[in-house]
Curated annotation (Swiss-Prot):
Coiled coil: none annotated. It comes from the Eukaryota. The chain crosses the membrane at residues 33-53, 77-98, 113-133, 178-198, 226-246, 288-308, 320-340, 347-367. Binds 2 heme b groups non-covalently. It is found in: Mitochondrion inner membrane. This is Cytochrome b. A ubiquinone binds at H201. Belongs to the cytochrome b family. Keywords: Electron transport, Heme, Iron, Membrane, Metal-binding, Mitochondrion, Mitochondrion inner membrane, Respiratory chain, Transmembrane, Transmembrane helix, Transport, Ubiquinone.
Length: 379
């Protein structure tokens, strides 16, 4: 008798994706982040669903409804902080996952990579509209500043901004539609993640060496299921520690003040995971230029497969490229720090230099290093 998991139409799909999937025998813990992202997504959808049961998307009651969730709903404070800090964990895993792809040349699976970039943009959009919902000062002013950037688009900009706002300022209509977007987008992300996985399983996983993986494959279960469970436990432990001991560590105190259109906070800044892009936006003293740089800071990922000059796929045996990769990581951390600082000397010039270095590393220095390493191979 054949096993049901290999014959049943639904079970077969799950079996081919998570049980009998041939997986390279040498993938490291950097390959854990894919499953951790899936876990984060499920956690965010579940906590979000319970929050949506008590939240009211209305300017007069939104802030109070969040306070009500934290004070009166059974374990409401826990669900709310799991959701808020879960977003931070989501982005940590996301950036680690992208970093792994860059380091080991996983971007050469172009369809998988491009869907991944699309996923990144969708998750960023979801996090942005979600940050507006508590209707605190930073929610309101963050929404105002970021949506206002669209007014930099020539000719149609102002009309577009008012269309998104649903009026002449960020108001009730904006909050209601942002709640609708925040509810629907995670399900779109889930569908995109399934397509991401579908394309990945067409080619199979990459591995740290960058050579073809089909030399030595092992079944996903039990080897990598147990490894993924370890990663999941560490993720949950970190999230619980963050949520139960320092729930407001990554948040902004300004968001505990109800939104007030008549008083602007001293420093308007997004959540930490957007600070690098915000620093790039601010470093260009021109509205349209800043918006284009902001977009390009994410969309530059699409061009990475086209900029592959090295004959080796992975950076495992490429010391020059490794040096540039870790310089890029340090540069992104610098940009994240600058994004949270006020616009004054010396932060302005540091931000501008870090922004130039960011694009220079990805578009010029890394491809050049690849060519140099090719030459060195011939020695």
């Amino acid at each position: 008798m054949t096993n049901i998991r290999k014959t049943h139409p639904l079970m077969k799909i799950l079996n081919d994706a998570f049980i009998d999937l041939p997986t390279p025998s040498n993938i490291s813990s950097w390959w854990n982040f894919g499953s951790l992202l899936g876990l984060c997504l499920i956690m965010q959808i579940l906590t979000g669903l319970f929050l949506a049961m008590h939240y009211t998307p209305d300017t007069s009651t939104a802030f109070s409804s969040v306070a009500h969730i934290c004070r009166d709903v059974n374990y409401g404070w826990f669900i709310r902080y799991l959701h808020a800090n879960g977003a931070s964990m989501f982005f940590i895993c996301l950036y680690a996952h992208i970093g792994r792809g860059l380091y080991y040349g996983s971007y050469m699976f172009q369809e998988t990579w491009n869907i991944g970039v699309l996923l990144l943009l969708t998750v960023m959009a979801t996090a942005f509209v979600g940050y507006v919902l508590p209707w605190g000062q930073m929610s309101f002013w963050g929404a105002t500043v970021i949506t206002n950037l669209l007014s930099a688009i020539p000719y149609i900009g102002t009309t577009l901004v008012e269309w998104i706002w649903g009026g002449f300022s960020v108001d009730k209509a904006t909050l209601t539609r942002f709640f609708a977007f925040h509810f629907i987008l995670p399900f779109i992300i889930t569908a995109l993640a399934a397509v991401h996985l579908l394309f990945l399983h067409e080619t199979g996983s990459n591995n740290p060496t960058g050579i073809p993986s089909n030399m030595d494959m092992i079944p996903f279960h039990p080897y990598y299921t147990i490894k993924d469970i370890l990663g999941a436990l560490l993720l949950i432990l970190t999230l619980l520690a963050l949520t139960l001991f320092t729930p407001d560590l990554l948040g902004d105190p300004d968001n505990y003040t109800p939104a007030n259109p008549l008083s602007t906070p001293a420093h308007i800044k997004p959540e930490w995971y957007f600070l690098f892009a915000y620093a790039i936006l601010r470093s260009i003293p021109n509205k349209l230029g800043g918006v284009l740089a902001l977009l390009l800071s994410i969309l530059v990922l699409i061009f990475i497969p086209m900029l592959q000059t090295s004959k080796q796929r992975s950076m495992m045996f490429r010391p020059f490229s490794q040096l540039l990769f870790w310089t890029l990581v340090a540069d992104l951390l610098t940009l994240t720090w600058i994004g949270g600082q006020p616009v004054e000397h010396p932060y302005i010039i540091v931000g501008q230099l870090a922004s130039i270095l960011y694009f220079l590393l990805i578009l010029v220095l890394m491809p050049t290093a690849g060519l140099i390493e090719n030459k060195l191979l011939k020695w």
